[in-house]
Amino acid sequence: MKFAVYTKWYWQNGVPTPAELQTNMNKAVSGDTSAEDVIWWKIDENHHQSLIIYPSEKIAEEELGKRQVKREKSRADNNIELVEEFMGPIMSRLTEL
């Protein structure tokens, strides 16, 4: 069963532009995860949210340590704070990811 990890982040200096966020994602995430998809979106001037879709809970748990290391680096590099995080199995979806 696919597994989702949702987070909300606070950017003290404001959420960067979409191009800057894409560059950040490419550096921090691309090629270094078993996630099927990672989606980031802006909700206001100082917050963004993210959704990571994993093939299974087991894989999400296996990558937890790696996610934590990347988060610490991102906090230091970008002056951001994790506001909330929720995880759970995907129960239904409209499309195949």
What are these regions (language model features)?
Residues M1-Q49, I53-V69, A76-L97:
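Short S/T/G/P-rich N-terminal loop/turn motif that feeds into the first structured element of a domain
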